[in-house]
A protein has these predicted regions:
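N-terminal nucleotide/polyanion-binding subdomain common to many enzyme families
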Residues: 1-75, 81
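Short, well-ordered alpha-helical microsegments
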Residues: 40-42, 106-107, 159-164
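Short hydrophobic/aromatic-enriched beta-strand-loop microsegments
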Residues: 55-57, 74-76, 119-125, 171-179
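Short gly/pro/ser/thr-enriched loop/turn and capping motifs at secondary-structure boundaries
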Residues: 62-64, 159, 181-186
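A transmembrane-helix-recognition feature enriched in membrane-embedded lipid enzymes
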Residues: 63-68, 191-232
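Conserved beta-alpha
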Residues: 63-142, 146
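Short, flexible loop segments at boundaries between secondary-structure elements
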Residues: 127-131, 173-209
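Proline-aspartate-enriched helix->loop->beta-strand connector
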Residues: 143, 147-157
Length: 232
């Protein structure tokens, strides 16, 4: 399977979740969720990180762009679901390290994972508040020493991608950026109901619940224009 370039951002057009999970089982690298915002506004540094690793289709915009390029069977794989499917498949085979959220959020996330997946090997975790270069170095040293198989980083883009690449230089593993997935998993943030997700309308649901997101959603108008004009 070949990567597809969308405005210089390379995306793997997976046709099933199983294909991506099989990739996780046989490769190492950073999994980056690709949506319209990343396609339009990725910095050169972020674009290089994505293209050296694995971009997968997380948003409806990215999925439509792939279909427009002829990959009719490409599917959207939401990152907030993918990390749990990775755990469900590999929780007895691989070790995990979690980074992100407030201290109470990461502790609740770890506790819930241990209840939901008895026997899961959580090699370590810490909150996402890194306040100094020394703390950053200590975290990287810790992960390199523990050598987990999978590292989840929930800090939002581009912070999480930059941190994952730094850790990757010291320790090869599967990395996945999760944004606010720990908040969703612990029930602090409500995800859009299934109907909205299935009909590629999750962005509209979020906008209704959080009107302050309107500035972030404006890029969707530009993205739709680009799709219409075949500029991707």
């Amino acid at each position: 399977m070949q990567k597809v370039s969308l405005n210089g951002v390379e995306v793997m057009p997976f046709t099933s979740e199983l294909e991506l999970l099989d990739y996780v089982d046989s490769h190492k690298g950073i999994l980056v969720a690709i949506n319209a915002e990343k396609i339009l506004h990725a910095t050169e540094q972020t674009r290089q990180i994505i293209n050296r690793n694995l971009g997968y289709c997380d948003g409806s915009g990215a999925m439509m762009a792939l279909k427009q390029k002829g990959f009719k069977n490409a599917i959207k794989i939401p990152g907030c679901e993918l990390w749990l499917k990775i755990i469900a498949r590999f929780n007895t085979e691989k070790s995990f390290y979690l980074i992100g959220g407030k201290q109470e959020v990461i502790e609740e996330t770890v506790g819930k994972l241990r209840r939901d997946y008895p026997g899961i090997n959580i090699a370590g975790y810490r909150n996402g508040y890194i306040n100094s270069d020394e703390e950053r170095r200590d975290l990287i040293d810790t992960v390199a020493r523990i050598k987990p198989d999978v590292v989840f980083v929930a800090m939002g883009s581009p912070k999480q991608e930059l941190l994952m690449e730094e850790i990757q230089r010291r320790h090869q593993a599967i990395f996945q950026g999760l944004g606010g997935s720990f908040d969703v998993y612990t029930g602090r943030v409500e995800r859009a109901p299934k109907w909205w997700v299935d009909h590629n309308m999750e962005f509209a649901y979020r906008l209704m619940r959080q009107p302050s997101r309107i500035k972030r959603q404006i890029h969707l108008v530009k993205f739709a224009f680009w799709l219409t004009c075949h500029k991707l």
